[in-house]
Regions:
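Short, charged/polar, Gly/Pro-enriched secondary-structure boundary elements
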Residues: 44-48, 57, 108-111
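Vicinal oxygen chelate
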Residues: 3-11, 57-115
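Short hydrophobic/aromatic beta-strand element in the GNAT-like acyltransferase core
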Residues: 37, 46, 66, 100-102, ...
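Acetyl-CoA-dependent GNAT
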Residues: 50-54, 115
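A short beta-turn/loop motif at secondary-structure boundaries
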Residues: 32, 56, 93-96
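Core segments of cupin and vicinal oxygen chelate
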Residues: 7-47
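Absolute protein N-terminus
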Residues: 1-2, 115
Length: 115
């Protein structure tokens, strides 16, 4: 059995798609609109992004999506790039056996980057 898709309700679907393409290499599907976008990972998992009202975009405190990296150096590089581009990201640290950091992504959800 293969997980096919996951839907995230976000503040702005297009902005979120462009962010995920730029920093995590997801492939966006052209078309759609600010309210509905689709991205794919390297395994063709479909992540649908649907715009919700600000009061509807609320995730539980522990909810996040994670992007595993091949090395700690890759984690550091993504962290530095996000920081240089003005995102509020904490420095990576050793947690649950991984070199990792969590941050609030555009769209209203948390991303973990780990290696």
């Amino acid at each position: 059995m293969k997980l096919n898709h996951v839907n995230l309700t976000v503040l702005d679907a297009l902005e979120t798609r462009l962010f995920l393409e730029k920093y995590f290499g997801l492939r966006g599907q052209e078309g759609g609109n600010r309210g509905f976008q689709v991205v794919y990972d390297d395994n063709d998992l479909v992540l649908t992004l649907i715009k919700g009202r600000a009061e509807d975009v609320k995730y539980p405190p522990t909810f996040h999506i994670g992007f595993i990296q091949p090395s700690e150096q890759h984690v550091d590089a993504i962290n530095a790039r996000l920081k240089a581009d003005g995102f509020d990201v904490p420095p990576p640290s050793r947690q649950h056996g991984s070199w990792t950091f969590y941050f609030q992504a555009p769209g209203g959800f948390v991303i973990e980057v780990l290696g």
